[in-house]
Regions:
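Hydrophobic side chains in well-ordered alpha-helices
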Residues: 190, 264-267, 307
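Long, charged, helix-rich clamp/arm modules that form nucleic acid-engaging surfaces
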Residues: 1-11, 18, 23-31, 51-55, ...
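Short helix/loop capping segments that flank catalytic or ligand/cofactor-binding pockets
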Residues: 176, 183-185, 261-263, 304-306
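Catalytic phosphate-handling regions of large nucleic-acid enzymes and associated NTPases
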Residues: 1-229, 293-295
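Extended, compositionally biased intrinsically disordered regions at domain boundaries
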Residues: 191-249, 262, 271, 352, ...
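Short amphipathic beta-strand starts and helix->beta connectors
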Residues: 160-161, 230-240, 272-282, 370-372
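Long hydrophobic segments that form regular secondary structure
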Residues: 242-283
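Flexible hinge/switch segments at interdomain interfaces of large molecular machines
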Residues: 1, 18-20, 59-63, 97-103, ...
Length: 415
């Protein structure tokens, strides 16, 4: 028994164990794949909805709890992790182009939570079907497949996305030793940049984020950030000064991504109590599901521009964010420039199209082989006898019938 005891340094063993755990977390949960720009949980939600539940339109929507339960066979990390990932995939104020659609409460621009999964129903959005599922609706052969965590099922390693989703919808995740933070960008800008590189790979690319709620980007060197895939930038919400019959008020029309209006209101109330906003008379929320409208009514004679600057300085209406374009390429985490990422995306699309056209070619060749059989039957001059033999195949040996047809028509086993 004594000989089976191995002496190890607990500190070194802890380091090795943490390193293995951190790699597992990075590869299986947090870092988006370079090919489709999706994190594993996002991909698995779409796979569950498309393959298992077939909820691909409003007429085939299913309870979100059913989607979460089905996704567990691909993503064994708990209900909350899966359902929490569905929320930003469905909201216009968290994704530029939502991949799924809810038929009821999926959160709000104020920062409200989504309804319980047993109440909401969801399905893949039209954009999700066209640009994320893409060619998978025709054949599974367009992407590589791998075993699930328990080796009981298969799942795609990536989806055949038609547009660079990673740049369009952005992503944010914090894991051990890394922080992936990619802002949303305009669909038109990203497509224009991609087409430019398609026609001229030596072109220089500069992309500027386009916040979901149309905020203002302040004093940033986007040429440098685009070339490095890394850097800081300042973004601030839109505040309009409005005059009405009662005086002036400030209308907050947008907040930076992942900054919620409820938190802004709480901070403003705190500033009022601290006498840092003594010129404010009242705060009211006139927001709708489609438009944020926080109104800050000012006292008579107040300086609206001064109050505006106080809000930017003391609340999250103006924040500094980071770009860190890190992706999982095979088993390696890489930081890429915008151009490098788009060039890789184009290569991935070429591979998807090659596989698709190869599938279509094989399908056409098989069909041609079948048609050739019909032609030989017509040219044989003995159609009635051949049809009689086929109709009465139940009463004769199958091997004899196949051998007779092959000799009679000079056809192959496949035909």
């Amino acid at each position: 028994m004594k000989d089976n005891i191995i002496q190890v340094d607990s500190r070194e063993e802890s380091k090795r164990g943490m390193a293995r755990y951190s790699l597992y977390i990075l590869y299986n949960r947090y870092v988006p794949d370079i090919r489709d720009g999706l994190k594993p949980v996002q991909r698995r939600i779409l796979v569950t909805m498309f393959y298992d539940l077939k909820c691909t339109s409003i007429n085939t929507k299913r309870k979100s709890a059913r989607t979460v339960g089905g996704c567990m066979k691909y993503h064994p990390h708990g209900n909350d992790a899966i359902y929490g990932a569905m929320k930003p995939m469905a909201n216009w104020f968290e994704s530029k182009l939502p991949l799924i659609t809810y038929d009821s409460a999926s959160g709000s621009i104020q920062g409200g939570p989504q309804a319980a999964m047993r109440y909401t129903e969801s399905y893949i959005s039209q954009f999700g079907m066209e640009c994320a599922i893409g060619e998978l609706s025709e054949t599974k052969q367009v992407v590589n497949w791998q075993k699930t965590f328990d080796n009981q099922d298969e799942e795609p390693e990536s989806l055949p996305v038609k547009v660079p989703l990673l740049l369009i919808n952005g992503t944010f995740s914090i894991a051990i030793g890394t922080r992936v933070e990619i802002p949303c960008h305009s669909l038109n800008d990203v497509i224009d940049a991609t087409l430019t590189l398609l026609h001229n790979p030596n072109s220089k690319i500069v992309l500027v984020p386009d916040q979901c709620m149309q905020c203002e980007i302040v004093n940033t060197d986007w040429k440098k950030i685009s070339n490095m895939g890394f850097g800081n930038y300042t973004v601030r919400g839109i505040i309009k000064i409005v005059d009405d019959k009662h005086g002036q008020y400030l209308s907050i029309r947008s907040t930076p991504d992942m900054v919620w209006s409820d938190g802004i209101m709480e901070k403003i109330e705190e500033l009022i109590k601290e006498n840092k906003l003594i010129q404010v008379a009242d705060i009211q929320d006139h927001s709708t599901d489609e438009q944020l409208d926080l109104r800050i009514y000012l006292k008579h004679g107040a300086d609206a521009n001064y109050v505006k600057q106080v809000l930017y300085k003391n609340t999250q209406l103006q924040v500094t964010k980071r770009v860190n374009l890190e992706v999982l390429n095979g088993m390696e985490i890489q930081r890429l420039s915008y151009k490098a990422y788009l060039l890789y995306f184009l290569e991935y699309r070429r591979s998807v199209k090659f596989r698709l056209y190869n599938f279509r070619l094989q399908k056409a060749e098989t069909r041609l082989h079948q048609i050739d059989t019909y032609i030989k039957i017509l040219e044989s001059g003995d159609i009635e006898n051949i049809v009689h033999m086929i109709r009465n195949q139940a009463s004769m040996d199958e091997a004899y019938l196949i051998n007779w047809l092959m000799n009679k028509l000079k056809i192959t086993d496949l035909q």
